[in-house]
Amino acid sequence: MLKQPEMILIDVDGTLVDSVPDLTFCTDTMMERLGLPLRGETKVRQWVGNGVERLIKRALVDNMEGEPEEDLYQKAETIFLALYADNTSKRSHLYPGVNEGLAWLKSQGYRVGCVTNKAAQFTYPLLTELGIIDYFEIVISGDTLPEKKPHPAPLLHAASHFGIAPEKALMIGDSISDVKAARAANFQIVCLSYGYNHGVDIRDSQPDSVIDSLIEIKNLLSQAA
């Protein structure tokens, strides 16, 4: 059973927002401009979750692992970042239950923050345009600190900001990166079943609980000790 938290941090991509449609558009447009084969949404959905740099590299080599030639990567990154700046939220959407779940958390007085590996230049427009930025008292992006998830630093930074002990904090995410960061920071961790985890069932990573919609956090926390 979960212990009652005082602070809750929530991941963005794959947890609150399905951003794959925009990431696929940018990836395939980048590939087209480079004269390379398009990769499509099914592959992009498997590749997301470790930041834009890894997504671009995976698209270039058509594999989860591997490194493209540096000059090709630099050219691709320039194209992708320009595209994504204009396509952060045009096709992306909130998952069902997100607005309701966030509203409930705020109504109950939880301190709520956002921790993502997405760069700030993309995070703030995305959260703003989807209408959820005001739910968060702090937003920690992938370039806020020298380290990002699965390193515990972003989570511990938020705990310090709120003045709350890590053992009284909860992370809500969707991937093994979120689980690793939470365990290393001594946070509890709840995962959404539908997110981006490279095709692997998130239950295999043994989070404290798994839910199918953010609105289910209401029942989970109502039963917390």
From Swiss-Prot:
Alphabetic keyword roster: Carbohydrate metabolism, Hydrolase, Magnesium, Metal-binding
Disulfide linkage: none
Active site: D11
Molecular function GO labels: metal ion binding; phosphoglycolate phosphatase activity
Names of required cofactors: Mg(2+)
This enzyme's EC code(s): 3.1.3.18
Chain residues that bind Mg(2+): D11, D13, D174
Record Gene3D superfamilies: HAD superfamily/HAD-like (3.40.50.1000), Putative phosphatase, domain 2 (1.10.150.240)
Gene Ontology terms: biological process: carbohydrate metabolic process; DNA repair; glycolate biosynthetic process
Task of the protein: Specifically catalyzes the dephosphorylation of 2-phosphoglycolate. Is involved in the dissimilation of the intracellular 2-phosphoglycolate formed during the DNA repair of 3'-phosphoglycolate ends, a major class of DNA lesions induced by oxidative stress.
PANTHER family in the record: PHOSPHOGLYCOLATE PHOSPHATASE (PTHR43434:SF1)
Name of the protein: Phosphoglycolate phosphatase
Organism of origin: Nitrosococcus oceani (strain ATCC 19707 / BCRC 17464 / JCM 30415 / NCIMB 11848 / C-107)
